[in-house]
């Protein structure tokens, strides 16, 4: 685990990003899904944020992270709620803007903690 983990606070260049499999998770996912650490965080560098509460477009920051580091893959963990829709959208836009071929996977969790 690295520190910081908030998307807004993490630097755009850091040694822990080199060759990393990245997890970009909505804030609520770790609380809704009981085995979040083992199933999603293990072996990944984790960034968290809430598109609704943070009120920013993460695409710019993520683009800089992708441009400045060798990211191997990105897994997005989001909730089924509409406000989480911005997270995979921002990641996909950032990968496209970086010009790199980084695989993106999206995992969706419902409020009861089930994978959907």
Where in this protein do the model-derived segments appear?
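Iron-sulfur-associated redox domains of electron-transfer enzymes in respiratory
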Residues: 1-116
């Amino acid at each position: 685990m690295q520190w910081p983990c908030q998307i807004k606070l993490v630097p755009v260049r850091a040694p822990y990003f080199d060759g990393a499999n990245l997890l970009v998770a909505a804030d609520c996912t770790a609380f809704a899904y009981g085995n979040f650490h083992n199933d999603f965080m293990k072996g990944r560098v984790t960034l968290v944020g809430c598109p609704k509460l943070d009120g920013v477009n993460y695409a710019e920051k993520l683009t800089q992270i992708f441009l400045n580091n060798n990211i191997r893959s990105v897994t997005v963990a989001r909730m089924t709620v509409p406000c989480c829709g911005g997270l995979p959208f921002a990641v996909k836009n950032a990968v496209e803007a970086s010009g790199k071929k980084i695989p993106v996977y999206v995992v969706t969790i419902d409020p009861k903690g089930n994978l959907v």
